């Protein structure tokens, strides 16, 4: 069972994958969004087809240092909704990360 990690940013999206046992992860690539989720979804399709044992997609959810959602979190939630509609047979989870911008 592999997990695909997605760090969804304004201009770029980082993609990482675990080993077949789900123990370690390594970065696969960084994809330029060019203002479109179609590019990212196409890349995720390619990866899912290449690694046919991906069972979970994990998306980083940005939070402020006080634990509240950032403005970026709303955009990320919309992207997660697209993932859930497109990949309804793959479990989709979020993981919180803190926005350290000052």
Give short role names for the model-derived ranges:
Residues 2-4, 11-102:
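Phosphate- and other anionic-substrate recognition elements at nucleic-acid/protein interfaces
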């Amino acid at each position: 069972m592999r997990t695909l990690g997605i760090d969804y940013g304004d201009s770029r999206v980082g993609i990482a994958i675990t080993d077949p046992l789900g123990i370690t992860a390594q970065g696969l690539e960084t994809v330029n969004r060019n203002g479109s989720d179609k590019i990212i979804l196409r890349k995720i399709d390619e990866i899912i087809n290449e690694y046919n044992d991906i069972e979970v997609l994990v998306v980083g959810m940005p939070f402020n240092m006080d634990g509240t959602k950032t403005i970026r979190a709303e955009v990320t939630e919309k992207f997660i909704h697209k993932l859930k509609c497109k990949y309804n047979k793959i479990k989709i989870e979020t993981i919180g990360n803190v926005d350290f911008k000052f």
